[in-house]
Amino acid sequence: LDNIKEGCKLLKEHLDNFNEIYLPVDPDCDGYTSAALFYNYLVDVLHYPIEKIIYHIPEGKEHGLSTIMNWFPEDGTNRLIVAIDSSSNDYEEHRSLSNRGYDILVVDHHEASKYSENATVINNQLSEKYMNKMASGVGVIYKFFECWESMYNGQSAQNYLDLVALGEISDVMQMTTSENRYICDYGLNHINNKFLRNLIKKQCYSLFGITEDKFNNNYYTNGSITQIGIAFYITPLINALIRVGNPLEKERLFQAFITPDILVPSTKRGEKGMEETICT
C-alpha cells in the first residue's frame, strides 16, 4: 500500500510526543469497526492515554470532514487527525486543516482522483501495486497495523480480525480475494470483541437455532458463525441504530465496541437511578 510506512512513522511521531489524536467516526458499520480497531489498538496494545484520543460521532449520515471542520480546535499544532473509511478526496479540507497546523492521516478504501497534497493518504484504490481492491476501511486499517508491527514489532493485529470480518461483511465486500476470505474465515472463528460476542449471544436463536441457556463460548471459535449469519442478523442491528438512533444511542454503540465495561445509567424497567455495564 502506498504511503503506509510514512503513515506509521507519522503516527509514531505523534504517539511518542503524547499528542492529541482526533478520530472522526464514519457513520456505518465499516466506519465504526475501523475506528474501534484503531482506538482499541492504541489503548490496549500501545497503552496510549484515552484522554488523548478524541473521537466524533456524527448525528446523521454525513461522511468526510466538510461538516465537522468546526469540531477541530482552531490551533492544530502538535495534533493529528486520523480519518478512517473516508476523506480521501477532501482536498480543500486537508489544505485548510494543514494551514491550521494539523497533520492528517487518511486510511481509506473509497475511490479518489488523486493523492492529497496536504495529507498522508493510504488507500487501496490508489495503490497500483496492492491487488486487493475489495478491502474495506477496516481492512485497510488492519493492513496499517500489520505494517506497524513489521516496523516496530508486535503480534496483536490479528486479535482484531473479528472486527475486520464484521466491517468487511457489512460493507458487502467481495470475498473472491484470498485476503478477504482469510480475514473472514479467521475473524469469524476468533470472536474477541466483547460487544460482538454479546450481540452473537443475544442473536443465538436466529444464528444457530438455540436459546441462550443452550449457548456456550464454543460458538465463538468452532466455525458456527457464518458470513450470511453476520450479514442477516448482526449487521442490520448496528446499521439500524446508526441510521435512526439518537446521538446518545450512537455514542453508546461506539462505546460498546471500545469500552464495554464502563458503567452507564440503566434503561431497564424498575432500575431508574441504577447503573449497569454497557455490555450487560
What are these model-predicted stretches?
Residues 26-27, 58-60, 86-87, 109-112, ...:
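Short, ordered loop/turn segments at secondary-structure junctions
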Residues 37, 115-170:
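Short alpha-helices
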Residues 70, 97-98, 117-122:
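Short low-complexity, flexible loop/linker segments enriched in glycine and/or proline
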Residues 104-105:
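Hydrophobic beta-strand scaffold residues
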